[in-house]
C-alpha cells in the first residue's frame, strides 16, 4: 500500500513536533510488538516446559540423542537437586576453565592476527562475565580478542549460559508440575534448550540482521578515508551478526564493539533497534506467559504479564520523560531532549525503552551512553537492576519472579488468615527460607562491595564525576554484576584488578548461589502432592494479588537500597533541577 503524500507529511510533522506524545506512542508500539511475538512463542515454550516434543524435534531429536550418547546421559536418567546442581556447576566450571586458557594463549591459536590479548584479571572477569550470562565488558577494543576467541569462547559461552539458565527454569517448573521427587536431567534439559529454542531463534535473527545491513565476515577491518582528512581509518569488522543474534536471543548483552548497540554496525537503524528489543524480551516474556498454559491457569499467566508490563510502562515513561525534559539547570535539552550519548537515528524514546528493557531483562545491552543520561533517566533504568531483573534472562526470569511470588503468597496468606499454597502445593518453612535467602542475597552482593569500595581512597582518583555521581556509578556497577545484567554506566576506570576480580566474584555468587537456592525450592516442591483446593488459599491470579506482588517487589527490592539511592541518583537529580533540597545540600 502506498500512502498519500499528505498523510506521510502529516505523520512526519506530528512525530517531529509532538515529541512527548510521539515518544509515548513509540514506547507502547515497542511493548505491543514484543507482547504479540512473546504470546505466539509462549505456546512453543509451554511444550518444552511440559516435556512434549515440539515441531522441530523431528530435526533436532537425532542431534540431541547423538550428544547424549557421547556424554553417556539420557532423559530417562532423572536427577534430584544435588546431582542436577553439581552437574550444572561442573559443566560450567570446565567450560569456563577452557575458555580462560583459550583467551590467555590465543596468540598461539589460529586467526589470532591483530589480537592484543588480556591481562589475567581481565581474562578472569571476561570469562566469568560471559559464563554467568552477565557480559559485563571491562574492555572496549574488539582487537583484544582474536576471531577464534570471539567465535568459540565468547559466542560459545553466550549459548552455554543461556542454555544453562533455561535448563534451570525447566527443572523448576518440573518441580512444581510433578511429584516424583526428581527435577530432570541437566544435560537433556540443556540440549533441548539449545537445539529446540535458542539456536533456531538465533539463526533466524542472524539472517534478518544480515539483510538489515549488519556485517557478517571474516575480514578483520575495512579501511576508509574520511572526506575531511587524508588519513586512513581502519574500522573493525567480523562475525558481528552472529554474535549480535545470540547476544539478544540469549539475553547476554555483550557487544562486538565497545559502544555495543550504539555502534552503527551492530545497530544500523530504527528497525534493527526494534528487532533487538524484541529479540531480548521474547523468550523471558514468552516464558512467563507460558506458565499460564503449563499450569492450566491462563489467569495466572495474564497476571504475570500485567505485573511485568507495569514495570515496563513505569520505568520506560520515567526514563523517557527524564531524558525528554533534559537538565533545565544546565540548559540541556530544551528542544531536543537529552541527546547526549544517543544515536540521532534512534532518538530519546527508543533509547529509553531499549535501556529499560535491557535492565528489566538480564540483557544489559545498550544503544547509548548511560553515563550521559540525566539522573531521572538513570533512575528509570536502574530500577530493573535493583529488583534483580524481574523479567530476567533466558530461564532465570521464571526463577526470579517465583521467589517474589512465594514470598508474596506467604505474606498475603498471613494477612488474611489462609494457608500459604502455590499451585495447590503447601509452602513450607524450607520454601520460605530459601526464597528469602534468594531475595536478601542480591542486595548484600551490591551494598557490601559498594561500602568497601568507598572506603578505599586511591580508587577515587579514577572517577571523573562528583561524589553523588560516584555513588550512582558504583551502585550501577555492582547491581549490574549481582543481577547478571552486564550493562555498564561507566564514569570510572573499571579495567583494573580490583574491579575485575571483585565483579567476577559478585557475578559468580549472583548466578550460582541464587540458582542453587531456587533449585532447592524446586526439589522441595517435587516431593509434594497437589491438594484439592477448598478456598483455603489466596487467589494468585487476580488483580489484588498482582497489586500485592508489585508492592512486595518494590518494598523488598527498592527499600534495601533507599539510603544509597538518596545519596546517589536522587541527590544528583535535586542538584540538576535546582530544588531547595539540592541548594541546601
Swiss-Prot record:
Pfam families: KdpA. PANTHER family: POTASSIUM-TRANSPORTING ATPASE A CHAIN, POTASSIUM-TRANSPORTING ATPASE POTASSIUM-BINDING SUBUNIT. It is a multi-pass membrane protein. Belongs to the KdpA family. Its main location: membrane. The system is composed of three essential subunits: KdpA, KdpB and KdpC. InterPro entries: KdpA. Signal peptide: none annotated. Part of the high-affinity ATP-driven potassium transport (or Kdp) system, which catalyzes the hydrolysis of ATP coupled with the electrogenic transport of potassium into the cytoplasm. This subunit binds the extracellular potassium ions and delivers the ions to the membrane domain of KdpB through an intramembrane tunnel. GO terms for cellular component: plasma membrane. The keyword Cell membrane applies. This is Potassium-transporting ATPase potassium-binding subunit. Keywords: Cell membrane, Ion transport, Membrane, Potassium, Potassium transport, Transmembrane, Transmembrane helix, Transport. It comes from Thermoplasma volcanium (strain ATCC 51530 / DSM 4299 / JCM 9571 / NBRC 15438 / GSS1).
